[in-house]
């Protein structure tokens, strides 16, 4: 086989493994280095693409984009049989042939915005990767991920890791207490309004 034929065969095997994805989803999955922006409506398969991208990173690394022209004849025969449906799917064999610089699962951070979505992401990763690999991926909400980082590293900023996180009601109660300590009227400075101003200042 020529170098170009070897590369084409390897990339065809990738597309076979991720055959349930459409062309646009596969393009996102195979783009390992750098950011990828996926714009699509609800229920169109964004989460599926994200899960598959994580799986590709862990199993194959940048094997699709960096596929080289080296392929022993035995592997070439097996890959062609796999592509033709004559060999059952063997992830470990595929990894041996196709993987280039696979990414360790604990180096992957998958962030979403709701606990429900984070739970779904973890469950789908476990069903594909198995519990052991999936549990090493940091899949969580944005807030949970930030809390983990702070708990682990906040002492570098001179603070303790035993901090508490206040919700809106906690924040209002604290502001009321501060106003009382300073003998400031709540009618003149409503606690809710001050808390909102502080929030706006942080977002500015």
Predicted regions and their residues:
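P-loop NTPase Walker
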Residues: 1-160, 165
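ATP-hydrolysis module of ASCE/P-loop NTPase motor domains
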Residues: 28, 113, 133-137, 154-204
